[in-house]
């Protein structure tokens, strides 16, 4: 098997003595996403939400810690958002550097060191933009529409093929392939010439990958699908 699905996780397989369990909520490389969270009992669940923060509603109460780099949906790189349960703060090992101790930042209102002010300012603008669109719930509805436009086409096509098990598909990153590597290369070249950039799949996976982060409008996804239909007609 390959990493194109989220495995079923049986609670009995989790060690109750573990310090924490970790998942990547949305895998940008393989295009998978957790739709059902593992039941870890009393052991804290930790997750990276860098690629889905602000894109869908998340019940943060189910986690011990969530963290996200800003660079996908929040703003320029340089800011990390951390949501941590109060009882998990202040338990750092003695060898933990000051800057890597969450208590340092919690006690100093995230101002222990000089913050990246411009990146934080841009993040604030993005937060206001999300609120103006109706909040995260409204943004999620838009993202679901975008994803359905692309996935519906992939499911109906016998030329393009989505690579992820349908129930585990990401709203943000959709990998897909054509029947041959030659066609993959031709599609990427022609798509780039037509103005569709960064469609080449991750180097470890190959094929193509369409990223549909919050800033991508529905119209952008529809134009991509229209181009894919044209390419299919001309090359099938």
Language-model features: locations:
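Conserved PLP-binding catalytic core of the aspartate aminotransferase-like
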Residues: 160-191
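Active-site phosphate-binding strand-loop segment of PLP-dependent enzymes
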Residues: 2-52
